[in-house]
């Protein structure tokens, strides 16, 4: 299951968990973001040991800016509040490989 984050404090509390957190930074107007969304949802079901969240960069621009997001979609992997990997672009194979490698 993918949870859409609603504010900065929620984002920080989730990414500080002692497990893999996969963040999808997206925009509603972004075609590639829409194209990969079903795969991201599928990964959340397949890799249930990780937490999957989405951040709308237009609604939560301060989170995106603080994280260093420059293009959408961007997928950041966190553990214990530290960003451990970054995938830019709608590349499901690369995203899945990164999830597997960091679980």
Swiss-Prot record:
Keyword Transport: yes
Chain positions of site Deprotonates C-terminal active site Cys: 24
Entry keyword set: Disulfide bond, Electron transport, Redox-active center, Transport
InterPro entries named among the record's database cross-references: Thioredoxin, Thioredoxin-like_sf, Thioredoxin_CS, Thioredoxin_domain
List of catalytic residues: 30 (nucleophile), 33 (nucleophile)
Alphabetical list of Pfam families matching this protein: Thioredoxin (PF00085)
GO molecular function: antioxidant activity; protein-disulfide reductase activity
BP GO terms, sorted: cell redox homeostasis; cellular detoxification of hydrogen peroxide; cellular response to reactive oxygen species; hydrogen peroxide catabolic process; L-methionine salvage from methionine sulphoxide; sulfate assimilation, phosphoadenylyl sulfate reduction by phosphoadenylyl-sulfate reductase (thioredoxin)
Contributes to redox potential value, annotated site positions: 31-32
Ranges where the Thioredoxin domain occurs: 2-103
UniProt record similarity statement: Belongs to the thioredoxin family.
Cited PANTHER family: THIOREDOXIN-LIKE PROTEIN 1 (PTHR46115)
Protein name according to UniProt: Thioredoxin-1
Gene behind this protein: trx1
């Amino acid at each position: 299951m993918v949870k859409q984050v609603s504010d900065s404090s929620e984002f920080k509390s989730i990414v500080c968990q002692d497990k893999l957190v996969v963040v999808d930074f997206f925009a509603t107007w972004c075609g590639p973001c829409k194209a990969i969304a079903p795969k991201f949802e599928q990964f959340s079901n397949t890799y249930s040991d990780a937490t999957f969240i989405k951040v709308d960069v237009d609604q939560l621009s301060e989170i995106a800016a603080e994280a260093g997001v420059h293009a959408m979609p961007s997928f950041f992997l966190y553990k214990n509040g530290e960003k451990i990997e970054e995938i830019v672009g709608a590349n499901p194979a690369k995203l899945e490989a990164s999830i597997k490698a960091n679980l």
